[in-house]
């Protein structure tokens, strides 16, 4: 079966997380992704957070599936020759270097267009044009500058970053969409274009409901926030709201049976208006169905702490899975707090390919996330990440058409590895 992106060749100059997230998604959809790495060391994440000495880390392997690796010293004249040839034959170049790095390598946008007018150049940067565009950005910096940290946490506590990598992986996913869109437009124009995704922009895009709330503040308090019911005045910026729901339907994380020993024995419950009477039945407060202080959503807004405390009295008598089963039977929105251990052992996620087991030649079998996007006519087969430079000769021969003698010349120049030592006669 053909893949959705069969025939698309991607030159992958990315490293760490944001860029590799993007190129891995393209590879999962069938693109031929050629990862360009520094001879001798490669992507820095190969050696970061290693759990097994002298073996590619999970940090690297889980972000670089389905790719081919070529080692290339782009400062070496022969290395630059190879890179130029790759630009000529590839469809997309993806990079997440610091500002200006690609230009200093001698490959400006204008130069790339001269080599291959159909080339799409996709870049991840920390910030878009403006006062901060030259600043270096990592995951937590992006969360802090994109509005996530200021709106995450509890009102009286510090701003918090999330466990989800919305800055790195989130921006990588945005860039992948931009690349596919540019490829589609190229069918009509015949030309490549630049595609840029800034990490600050990506985080802010995912925080759009908080930008919504910022504007709502101009017209009065945010009544679904718990501080409204507590009589605490709002300031001029969206506050941190703990675990209050961001969708306008009040919700909280509540304790379940065993919470004293299990840090994840909790469930999230939403008091959605259409199922309010069913909630009252479940928790044994049938009088609340008609009581003027509880019967309508506006009346309940000032009593959310009391209401959720009562619901929690009920959830504490059930395990999180028991509570979920009972609530789901009445279409009451809820979800257990699942630990990474529980997710890793969830057989339904294995069955759908959301979690996959991958076999690696040096580290053995490990678990990874699979493709979260399922295409009926282009199923994803997750293949292991490449060893450093594993496909160098294959790419030189099969992609660029180099002869054995030309490949040997490239190697001897030191463009792909230190020059070979001559054997003593």
From Swiss-Prot:
Known EC number: 2.8.3.16
Database matches in SUPFAM superfamilies: CoA-transferase family III (CaiB/BaiF)
Keyword Transferase (UniProt): yes
UniProtKB keywords: Transferase
Pfam families: CoA_transf_3
Binding positions for CoA per the UniProt entry: 17-18, 38, 72-75, 96-98, 104, 136-139
GO molecular function, one term: formyl-CoA transferase activity
Annotated family: Belongs to the CoA-transferase III family. Frc subfamily.
Record-given protein name: Formyl-CoA:oxalate CoA-transferase
Organism: Rhodopseudomonas palustris (strain ATCC BAA-98 / CGA009)
Name of the encoding gene: frc
């Amino acid at each position: 079966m053909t893949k959705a992106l069969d025939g698309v060749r991607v030159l992958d100059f990315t490293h760490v997380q944001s860029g590799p997230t993007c190129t891995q998604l393209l590879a999962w959809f069938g693109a031929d992704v050629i990862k360009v790495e520094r001879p001798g060391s490669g992507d820095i994440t190969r050696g970061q957070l290693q759990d097994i000495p002298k073996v590619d880390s999970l940090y690297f392997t889980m972000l670089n599936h389905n790719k081919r690796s070529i080692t290339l010293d782009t400062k070496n004249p022969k290395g630059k020759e190879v890179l130029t040839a790759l630009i000529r034959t590839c469809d997309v170049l993806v990079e997440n270097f610091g500002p200006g790095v690609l230009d200093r390598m001698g490959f400006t946008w204008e130069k790339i267009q001269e080599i291959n007018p159909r080339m799409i150049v996709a870049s991840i940067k920390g910030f878009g044009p403006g006062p901060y565009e030259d600043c270096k950005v990592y995951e937590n910096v992006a969360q802090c500058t994109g509005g996530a940290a200021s709106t995450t946490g509890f009102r009286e506590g510090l701003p918090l970053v999330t466990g989800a990598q919305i800055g790195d992986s989130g921006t990588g996913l945005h860039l992948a969409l931009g690349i596919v869109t540019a490829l589609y437009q190229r069918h009509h124009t015949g030309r490549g274009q630049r595609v840029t995704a800034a990490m600050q922009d990506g985080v802010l895009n995912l925080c759009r409901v908080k930008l919504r709330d910022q504007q709502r503040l101009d017209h009065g308090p945010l009544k679904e926030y718990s501080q409204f019911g507590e009589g605490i005045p709002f300031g001029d910026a969206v506050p941190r709201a703990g675990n209050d729901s961001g969708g306008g339907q009040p919700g909280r994380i509540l304790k379940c049976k065993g919470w004293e020993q299990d840090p994840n024995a909790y469930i999230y419950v939403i008091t959605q208006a259409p199922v309010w009477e069913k909630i009252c039945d479940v928790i044994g407060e049938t009088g609340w169905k008609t009581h003027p202080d509880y019967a309508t959503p506006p009346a309940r807004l000032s009593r959310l702490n009391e209401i959720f405390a009562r619901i929690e009295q009920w959830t504490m008598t059930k395990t999180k899975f028991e509570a979920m089963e009972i609530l789901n039977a009445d279409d009451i929105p809820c979800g257990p707090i699942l630990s990474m251990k529980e997710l890793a052992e969830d057989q339904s996620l294995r069955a759908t390919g959301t979690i996959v087991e991958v076999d690696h030649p040096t580290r053995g079998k490990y678990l990874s996330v699979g493709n979260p996007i399922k295409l009926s006519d282009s199923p994803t087969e997750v293949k292991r990440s490449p060893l450093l430079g594993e496909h160098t000769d294959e790419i030189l021969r099969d992609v660029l058409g180099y002869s054995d003698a030309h490949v040997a010349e490239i190697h001897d120049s030191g463009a792909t590895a230190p020059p070979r030592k001559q054997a003593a006669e």
